[in-house]
A protein has these predicted regions:
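C-terminal functional extensions of proteins
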Residues: 2, 239-313
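Electropositive, gly/pro-rich neighborhoods at or near active sites that engage anionic ligands
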Residues: 2-3, 39-175
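Extreme N-terminal starter segment of soluble prokaryotic enzymes
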Residues: 6-11
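Short Gly/Thr/Asp-enriched flexible loops that form oxyanion-binding sites at enzyme active sites
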Residues: 23-27, 206-219, 283
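A short helix->loop->beta-strand "cap" motif at the edges of active sites that frequently abuts
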Residues: 31-33, 222-226, 286-287
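Short internal beta-strands
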Residues: 36-40, 225-232, 268-274
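Active-site glycine-rich loop that binds ribose-phosphate moieties when present
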Residues: 170-189
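Redox- and metal-dependent alpha/beta enzyme cores, enriched for Fe-S-associated oxidoreductases
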Residues: 210-249
Length: 313
């Protein structure tokens, strides 16, 4: 596939699966040095004594062509360690494959030796053969916490993985965000970007944690063009709780809610072609709306959407 000559550097704000697929599409059509992916770390956690960075790893595995069939994990991974842990009486409800564990072991060892998360990420990305730049939003501890309607505060992993995001959400917080600093290179990449994309990730759970890091939202707002891709189709998420969480937090239904989630941030919003009626219905906003086929599970579809988005600029 021929590379598209971009008019300048590109930044993508990304969560997990949806963002990873959009990153894959952009990487397929851009020169490698043109793309920086800034990734959510709000769902980082400690599991089995290891520092896990699920969104960073999902993006890295997808860009490397090694993602598992659901869109996360490593394709063809084995689970021997999980079997051994289970035999020792360890709770293994949080399933991590052996190859995935190796990445988490390498990351944790480096962090404990004083290396920053961004430095570890750059090194692991190089080991996986990535050509574009992959950065965490922050090197500092920032954790998404979900307050359920039943009154419990849950870590993101407890809410999303162990409890299957079935709980009704009452509130979302980003612990540590106020004291967090953007990772080295993040603000510089955004300031240099001719175009910032917001991936079709869950706004409150994947993109808001990035924007909660002081300085990042202001940097994005100052960018000449900020284009988001809606994560909704007919008002619903294809998978995951984006629509339910947005509603629980008081955002309007459908793409009006996506606009509200990114109020004051966007120049453009791309909705799915099946929601083309929203282009006219929501045209009274200052944001330009566009309709396209935004289903990007397949590689070719992700590249097609990437070319469309770049042509908008």
């Amino acid at each position: 596939m021929r590379e598209r000559q971009s008019s300048g550097p590109i930044v993508l704000l990304s969560g997990g699966v949806g963002g990873a697929r959009m990153a894959r599409g952009l990487a397929a059509v851009l020169p490698p040095a043109a793309l920086t992916v800034v990734v959510n770390v709000g769902d980082d956690d400690e599991i089995y004594g290891l520092h896990i960075s699920p969104d960073l790893d999902t993006v890295a595995y997808t860009l490397a062509g090694r993602e598992g069939p659901p869109g996360w994990g490593v394709a063809g991974d084995t689970f021997a360690v999980m079997g051994h842990l289970g035999a020792l009486g360890v709770d293994t409800n949080f399933r991590v494959g052996d190859a995935d564990l190796a990445v988490n072991l390498a990351r944790t060892a480096a962090l404990r030796c004083g290396e920053s998360l961004s430095a570890v990420t750059v090194r692991l990305a190089a080991a996986l053969g990535l050509a574009c730049r992959l950065l965490p939003a922050t090197d500092d501890c920032l954790r998404t916490r979900v307050h359920t309607a039943a009154g419990e505060w849950l870590s993101f992993q407890d809410y999303f993985v162990l409890r299957g995001h079935r709980d009704e959400v009452a509130e979302v917080r980003y612990e540590g965000a106020g004291a967090a600093r953007p990772a080295p290179g993040v603000l510089e990449a955004i300031a240099a970007a001719s175009l910032v994309f917001v991936a079709p990730s869950n706004p409150p759970l994947s993109i808001w944690p990035i924007l909660a890091v002081p300085g990042i939202r202001d940097a994005v707002t100052a960018a000449p063009r900020v284009i988001a891709v809606s994560p909704l189709f007919g008002g619903r998420a294809l998978k995951g709780p984006a629509d339910r969480v947005m509603a629980a937090l008081g955002l309007p239904p459908g793409n009006a809610g996506v606009l509200a989630a990114y109020d004051g941030l966007l120049t453009d919003l791309v909705v799915d072609q099946d929601d083309a009626a929203d282009v006219a219905a929501l045209s009274r906003t200052a944001v330009r709306l566009h309709a396209a086929d935004t289903r990007i599970a397949a590689r070719d579809d992700a590249a097609r959407l990437a070319r469309y988005l770049l042509d908008l600029s």
